[in-house]
């Protein structure tokens, strides 16, 4: 599998109560879990017959368990040279929270942030390439950043990842995707309700949104993952039955019926039926 530089390649969930999170996502998405062992801190590989991502108990920057940290999904982007990428990130106004580290023979990772503070991961593959966005229910199919500094972040992703920042004409907000056609993987949204996208075409998977009007008070700029489901309304009902919350009720969009929800520990994510 070949994955382009700057494309979403992995997600992981950090949760204060990992066992409860496992039960929730097993019921909602049918996720299966495989432990990687103590050498990897109890990290779980998640699948639905194809790779989905990973899950782990929350840890601080010292590698210590820290249940005070919020539940959250982290999106990782592929890079060819992780050391050069982290240098580019700081040179273009971003931050490095976790410096590049080797993960066995799998590859290397880092945790960084855009100028707005939206955190994300980097992955330089060795033996493990990550996932492919198959569109199967329970897998991640779209990656979107809601940002309080749209212009700075759009320029940042363009300069660091080579994203094309393609405006999304069908959006009511300022929104761009990283490319067009089959190369589109992510989006960036202006919180003032104006949109733009980072790619275009059938492979668009990410977007950038100006979040100044869309972000609730106190919620920082962030990357949000959207998962495929067969029936959004049924999935929302399941989320509520399992103790989760609805942030945006189901609505029809040009790309399919869509909602934003959160698990019982507060991790937000989107669901879409296409």
Tell where the protein language model's regions lie, with residue ranges.
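Glycine/small-residue-rich hydrophobic helix-like segments
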Residues: 179-191, 201-251
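Short, structured motif recognition centered on aromatic/hydrophobic residues
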Residues: 8-12, 70-79, 96, 120-123, ...
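Surface-exposed beta-loop interaction hotspot
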Residues: 110-169
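Ligand-binding pocket scaffold of soluble enzyme catalytic domains
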Residues: 12, 21, 29-30, 34-36, ...
């Amino acid at each position: 599998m070949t994955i382009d530089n700057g494309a979403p390649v992995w997600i992981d969930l950090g949760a204060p109560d990992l066992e409860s999170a496992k039960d929730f996502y097993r019921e909602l998405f049918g996720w299966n879990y495989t432990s990687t062992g103590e050498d990897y801190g109890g990290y779980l590989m998640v699948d639905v017959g194809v790779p989905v991502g990973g899950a782990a108990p929350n840890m601080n920057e010292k590698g210590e368990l820290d249940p005070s940290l919020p539940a959250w999904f982290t999106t990782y982007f592929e890079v060819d040279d992780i050391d050069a990428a982290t240098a580019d990130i700081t040179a273009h106004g971003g931050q490095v929270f976790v410096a590049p580290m080797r993960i066995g023979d799998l590859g290397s990772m880092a945790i960084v942030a855009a100028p707005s503070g939206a955190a994300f991961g980097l992955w330089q593959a060795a033996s493990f390439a990550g996932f492919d966005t198959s569109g199967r229910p329970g897998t991640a199919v779209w990656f979107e950043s809601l940002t309080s500094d749209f212009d700075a972040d759009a320029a940042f992703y363009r300069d660091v990842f080579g994203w094309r920042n393609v405006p999304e004409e069908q959006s009511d907000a300022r929104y761009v995707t990283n490319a067009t056609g089959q190369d589109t993987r992510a989006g960036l949204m202006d919180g003032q309700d104006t949109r733009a996208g980072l790619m275009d075409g059938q492979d668009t998977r990410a977007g950038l949104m100006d979040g100044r009007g869309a972000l609730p008070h106190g919620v920082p700029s962030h990357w949000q993952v959207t998962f495929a489901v067969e029936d959004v309304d049924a999935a929302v009902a399941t989320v509520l039955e399992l103790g989760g919350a609805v942030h945006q009720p189901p609505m029809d969009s040009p790309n399919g019926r869509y909602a934003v929800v959160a698990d019982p520990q507060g991790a937000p994510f989107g669901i879409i039926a296409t």
